[in-house]
């Protein structure tokens, strides 16, 4: 039911949602629900293990019946697939991933505590974003060469430790997962942005996106740079173009775009109207 309500809210009511005065609190509540319900309760944390197992099964002519053994996760995969067509990777990575939600909530706590933030320069940000594709390529190669070790290779994801076992594993695994959560408190969603192989796969799947769903104006990027500066994912170019492969659908830029008190082009247009009326 939650997924059924979330999809139309993001698809047809995103401007209303982004413009709501309590949107940050609403988003935090949704992320907390995803973490608790989809993650801890439903065990619906998607993993790179599934697509790797599909690759191995197709190579060996095996059955894909294992996909229906977990209906809850299959439903989340289906929602992510719909997201590919409508928004790109953003639906899953920004809203439906329990570990992503955990990192986002950890960041919110860090900001409340006023912890110092360490963000890479734009040059290093672009470089680091390529790492996740290298990790994905290595995992795919591993699945083809040694399919029996897929689960071992996939430990690069902290999902099993953090979500599936609630951090109750041998200390190296727990420390690894806690390290990524801790890093997200000083470097915004570092695992998601730079290392996550599932995120890389989602970005590739997002190439199926059928539309540019984020509204833009001619002044976006030239001269206005507000959305680019505010985008914590680094998904907006200096030209104002949205890099949908790095967009997590946080809707912050939609909020700015539609707000006459924040959007610089709207502010300037209002001032011109005032001068004409004077």
Task: List where the protein language model places each region.
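Non-ligating segments of multi-cofactor redox enzymes
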Residues: 1-239, 245-246, 252-278
């Amino acid at each position: 039911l939650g997924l059924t309500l979330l999809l139309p809210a993001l698809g047809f009511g995103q401007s209303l949602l982004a413009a709501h005065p309590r949107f940050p609190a609403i988003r935090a509540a949704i992320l907390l629900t995803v973490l608790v319900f989809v993650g801890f309760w439903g065990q619906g944390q998607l993993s790179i293990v599934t697509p790797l197992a599909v690759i191995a099964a197709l190579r060996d002519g095996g059955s894909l019946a294992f996909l229906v053994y977990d209906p809850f996760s299959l439903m989340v995969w289906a929602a992510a697939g719909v997201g590919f067509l409508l928004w790109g990777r953003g639906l899953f990575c920004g809203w439906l991933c329990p570990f992503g939600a955990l990192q986002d909530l950890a960041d919110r706590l860090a900001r409340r505590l006023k912890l110092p933030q360490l963000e890479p320069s734009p040059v290093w940000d672009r470089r680091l974003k390529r790492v996740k594709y290298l990790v994905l390529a290595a995992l795919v190669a591993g699945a083809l060469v040694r399919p029996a070790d897929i689960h071992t290779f996939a430990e690069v994801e902290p999902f099993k430790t953090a979500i599936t076992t609630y951090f109750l594993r041998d200390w190296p695994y727990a420390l690894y997962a806690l390290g990524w959560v801790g890093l997200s408190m000083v470097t915004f969603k570092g695992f998601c942005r730079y290392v996550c192989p599932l995120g890389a796969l989602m970005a590739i799947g997002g190439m199926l996106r059928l539309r540019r769903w984020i509204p833009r104006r001619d002044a976006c990027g030239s001269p206005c740079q507000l959305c680019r500066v505010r985008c914590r994912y680094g998904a907006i170019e200096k030209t104002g173009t949205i890099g949908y492969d790095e967009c997590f659908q946080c809707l912050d830029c939609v909020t700015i775009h539609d707000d006459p008190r924040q959007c610089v082009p709207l502010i300037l247009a209002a001032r011109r109207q005032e001068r004409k009326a004077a």
